[in-house]
């Protein structure tokens, strides 16, 4: 055996080094570096522009974008008709009709901040299926 006993007559020091803990630590470090390196190499440093309220007022807003409202419960409302709730299939057909009337139609999605992302994703998919490429999101500006 590699381990000596107290009663052994062999007084020479044990020359075998146990490398198992060293290998374990090295493998853990290797795994940590393998996980963190893609995160470090794929980040792109950006300095995003900031917009003031004055700059927002100066932007030319398109005339009457088609408003698609999504309430907190996931209900869809197309246009200014807040009384009639429609299903996602009806949303797509109304967006197609708007695209046929105006080739450059712009959709403004106004989603409640409590709505799940899945409902917004379905609205975006309906707009894509209708062939609409100009889509914006309605937000509130922070009061300073």
Swiss-Prot record:
InterPro entries: ExbD. It is a single-pass type II membrane protein. Residues 1-18 are cytoplasmic. Pfam families: ExbD (PF02472). GO terms for cellular component: plasma membrane. It comes from the Bacteria. Residues 40-144 are periplasmic. Keywords: Cell inner membrane, Cell membrane, Membrane, Protein transport, Transmembrane, Transmembrane helix, Transport. One of its GO terms (biological process) is protein transport. The chain crosses the membrane at residues 19-39. The keyword Transmembrane applies. One of its GO terms (molecular function) is transmembrane transporter activity. Disulfide bonds: none annotated. It is found in: Cell inner membrane. Belongs to the ExbD/TolR family. The accessory proteins ExbB and ExbD seem to form a complex with TonB. Involved in the TonB-dependent energy-dependent transport of various receptor-bound substrates. This is Biopolymer transport protein ExbD. It comes from Neisseria gonorrhoeae. The lineage of its organism: Bacteria, Pseudomonadati, Pseudomonadota, Betaproteobacteria, Neisseriales. The gene is exbD.
């Amino acid at each position: 055996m590699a381990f000596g006993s107290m009663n052994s007559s062999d007084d020479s020091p044990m020359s075998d080094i146990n490398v198992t803990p060293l290998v374990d630590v090295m493998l853990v470090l290797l795994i940590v570096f393998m996980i963190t390196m893609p995160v470090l190499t794929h980040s792109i440093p950006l300095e995003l522009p900031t917009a003031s309220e004055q700059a927002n007022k100066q932007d030319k807003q398109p005339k009457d974008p088609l408003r698609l409202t999504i309430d907190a419960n996931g209900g869809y409302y197309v246009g200014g008709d807040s009384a009639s709730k429609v299903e996602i299939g009806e949303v797509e057909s109304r967006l197609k009709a708007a695209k046929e009337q105006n080739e450059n139609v712009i959709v403004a999605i106004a989603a409640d901040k409590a709505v799940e992302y899945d409902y917004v994703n379905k609205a975006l998919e309906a707009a894509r299926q209708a062939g609409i490429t100009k889509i914006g999101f309605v937000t509130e500006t922070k009061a300073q």
